[in-house]
Amino acid sequence: MKKTVKALAAYQAELPVETVKAKYGLQHLARLSANESVYGPSPKVAQAVRAVSDDILGYYPDGQATELREAVAKLNHVDPQHLVFGAGADELIELLTRVVLEPGSNIIIPNPTFGEYAMHAQIEQSTTKKIPVNVDNGNVDFDAILDAIDDKTAMVWIANPNNPTGVFETTSSIKRFLDKLPANITLVVDEAYYDFVDEPDATVAPLVAEYTNLVVLRTLSKAYGLANLRVGYGIMQDPLYSAMQAVRLPYNLSTYQIAGGTAAVLDQEYLQKNVQRFQVERQKFQDFLTKNKFKFYESQANFIWIKVGETKKVGQKLLEQGFQVNDRLNPEWIRIALGTPEDNAELKLAFLKATNK
């Protein structure tokens, strides 16, 4: 077994809602720890999945996810042959790391950010350089990343909006960074939460046509509400496209995933309705935090990163009141996803109580 794998700890997933409710004697639990959509997917998703014929169960699915590929390409105005599909963006993170990294190479990431980037680098026997975000506003320090590059640097990862901070980097700032980044270094912009952004030019996807070292990742797990179905995609040019197609499993999406994912992508009216709900609730909750003098980073995602002091104590107090949040990422900061308007209203009261305000 690889020494780098021996050093890893298994991911601690959220317990089932009913298990947590039973443990704490709760009538209602708002699960706000995994950045899921409380509104779920378009009703057309279930219709599409149910419409899949039982006759296909004995046959492998479409290995190119043709129907989904065409829908995603049209939505994003990209070449269908620039799309690689995976079981969520997680699979694509794993594959990109496998394709790009050699033992002894390194990646550069902001700190904090999504933990899987560093984990997969470790598996591939690469090291990770962590560059602190701006302490005042959470923005990525692109100049410090450029200064950290050496002859072993192979990848830079930018989650945009960032997870767990929710902070958004403009397309112009990323383009300036790309223009300074050596062409042999792959920049991956993980846009898992880009659907929630209410700023113009929310995506760098159009830049893929200009830069062969740029990859954009997307998922249907968040705004589209398909976390259980596991569908993600990457936008990239050759040679990365061909390499990713070569290493991915040949039938990595089932017919159910393809059908459900396609239905979700085609129902943009449902998506936008729910995104607007999240944007309204996000602003209301950030106004509440400002009014009560909490430090937080301005979010463009469906969650907020808040400084609370003793994170574990606050998280436990919230859980006892029926709100499951993510208190595992930082000893002083907590990440709370937005729930329904009703849950968010109750959460404000619970949050004041949990933080002794």
Swiss-Prot record:
Top-rank taxon of the source lineage equals: Bacteria
Disulfide bond annotation, renumbered to this chain: none
PTM annotation (N6-(pyridoxal phosphate)lysine): residues = K222
To which species is this protein native?
Leuconostoc mesenteroides subsp. mesenteroides (strain ATCC 8293 / DSM 20343 / BCRC 11652 / CCM 1803 / JCM 6124 / NCDO 523 / NBRC 100496 / NCIMB 8023 / NCTC 12954 / NRRL B-1118 / 37Y)
**Classification via Pfam families:** Aminotran_1_2
The molecular function GO annotations come to: histidinol-phosphate transaminase activity; pyridoxal phosphate binding
Q: Would you identify the family this protein belongs to, as annotated?
A: Belongs to the class-II pyridoxal-phosphate-dependent aminotransferase family. Histidinol-phosphate aminotransferase subfamily.
Task: Look up the record and name the cofactor or cofactors this protein needs.
Answer: pyridoxal 5'-phosphate
The name this protein goes by in its record: Histidinol-phosphate aminotransferase
Q: Which NCBIfam families would you find in this protein's record?
A: hisC
Q: Which reaction does it catalyse?
A: L-histidinol phosphate + 2-oxoglutarate = 3-(imidazol-4-yl)-2-oxopropyl phosphate + L-glutamate
Known EC number(s)? Answer: 2.6.1.9
